Amino acid sequence: MSGFDNLNTDFYQTSYSIDDQSQQSYDYGGSGGPYSKQYAGYDYSHQGRFVPADMMQPQQPYTGQIFQPTQTYTPTTPQPFYGNNFEDEPPLLEELGINFDHIWQKTLTVLHPLKVADGSIMNETDLAGPMVFCLAFGATLLLAGKIQFGYVYGISAIGCLGMFCLLNLMSMTGVSFGCVASVLGYCLLPMILLSSFAVIFSLQGMVGIILTAGIIGWCSFSASKIFISALAMEGQQLLVAYPCALLYGVFALISVF
């Protein structure tokens, strides 16, 4: 036993005591801790500079109740991109500017030269009827063995441009190019009758010359009457009818020869 006591005495230092351990305890709340030497230079008070400014603003408290929206919230239904009611949409022909009633009235005005023309209807830009009449005129020439579609459209374009310049110089209100093309195209309808006669009969005799002169006068008189009523050019019908007669005379020459 004496040997065991000597071993314990050698293992433990005689100067060690619990009081010494309490003196070596670290004060972690102060600046004398073991970690204060390594991180003493870092200032934690500057961490707020990395926070965005919008996050630092105080948020508005929610004043509503559970399952009840606030008074400022007004729910709205999303608006659809396309209309749900197709009945409110205008017809396709109306969107394209094709009115069969006005086309029929303009056609009757051309077929009845003595009928008073409606200036409000004739002042519209309607090219559906003139395109059909130009195609019909070219088709009747084709039945007679004359392929003249290029001449028909070319002469029509040049004639419309010339009448457009002339009417703008003569009238006080002015006129659009579409209106001039529409009126001249509708007044081409009697010329279709002349080209239809040329399919069956020859127009190079005396009867053909008289018929051709009558058709030219018919077309030019109808066109001048419509221009006078649409542009309020009273007393100038003969001045307008003369260039119209020159234009329709070219179409008559194509039909006869």
Curated annotation (Swiss-Prot):
GO cellular component: COPII-coated ER to Golgi transport vesicle; endoplasmic reticulum exit site; endoplasmic reticulum membrane; nuclear outer membrane-endoplasmic reticulum membrane network; nucleoplasm; trans-Golgi network
Segments of this protein annotated with the region Interaction with Sec23: 75-106
Intrachain disulfide bonds: none
Subcellular location, record wording: Endoplasmic reticulum membrane; Golgi apparatus, cis-Golgi network membrane; Cytoplasmic vesicle, COPII-coated vesicle
Topological region Lumenal: 146, 195-196
Pfam family name, one: Yip1
Residue intervals annotated with topology Cytoplasmic: 1-124, 168-173, 218-236
InterPro entries xrefs: Yip1/4-like, Yip1_dom
Record field: transmembrane: 125-145, 147-167, 174-194, 197-217, 237-257
Domain of life, per lineage: Eukaryota
Keyword annotations: Cytoplasmic vesicle, Endoplasmic reticulum, ER-Golgi transport, Golgi apparatus, Membrane, Protein transport, Transmembrane, Transmembrane helix, Transport
GO biological process: endoplasmic reticulum to Golgi vesicle-mediated transport; insulin processing; protein transport; regulation of ER to Golgi vesicle-mediated transport; vesicle fusion with Golgi apparatus
Membrane topology according to the record: Multi-pass membrane protein
Subunit relationships: Interacts with the COPII coat components Sec23 (SEC23A and/or SEC23B) and Sec24 (SEC24A and/or SEC24B). Interacts with YIF1A. May interact with RAB1A. Interacts with YIPF3 and YIPF4.
UniProt record similarity statement: Belongs to the YIP1 family.
Protein's job: Plays a role in transport between endoplasmic reticulum and Golgi. In pancreatic beta cells, required to transport proinsulin from endoplasmic reticulum into the Golgi.
Protein name: Protein YIPF5
